[in-house]
């Protein structure tokens, strides 16, 4: 079953946020394998994953190392997850896609 993962991180600086995003984007495909939706902001990342295993692999192999490179830890963020029963989205084809964002 799909899961929604919400990460809240109010402790990073704008510079750390940009550098983390840059490292994540350069370390593999965007969106990451198994990620169906990502809504990103400086303090929040809301993602929908095919499985907890896909999410955990991304955290361990890409986001965790990007945090560590900044001297930060994912242990310091607030994480919430829940099972997704229904996901409804409008036509996203016309939405702006920012080159500097990923989680």
Residue ranges and their predicted role:
Residues 1-46, 50-65, 71-103:
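Short S/T/G/P-rich N-terminal loop/turn motif that feeds into the first structured element of a domain
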């Amino acid at each position: 079953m799909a899961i929604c993962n919400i990460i809240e991180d109010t402790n990073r600086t704008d510079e750390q946020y940009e550098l983390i995003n840059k490292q994540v984007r350069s370390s593999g495909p965007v969106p990451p394998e198994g990620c169906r939706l990502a809504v990103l902001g400086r303090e929040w990342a809301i993602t929908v994953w095919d499985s907890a295993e896909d999410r955990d692999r991304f955290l361990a192999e890409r986001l965790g190392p990007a945090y560590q490179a900044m001297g930060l830890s994912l242990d310091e963020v607030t994480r919430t997850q829940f099972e997704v029963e229904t996901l409804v989205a409008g036509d996203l084809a016309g939405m702006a896609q920012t080159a500097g964002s990923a989680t």
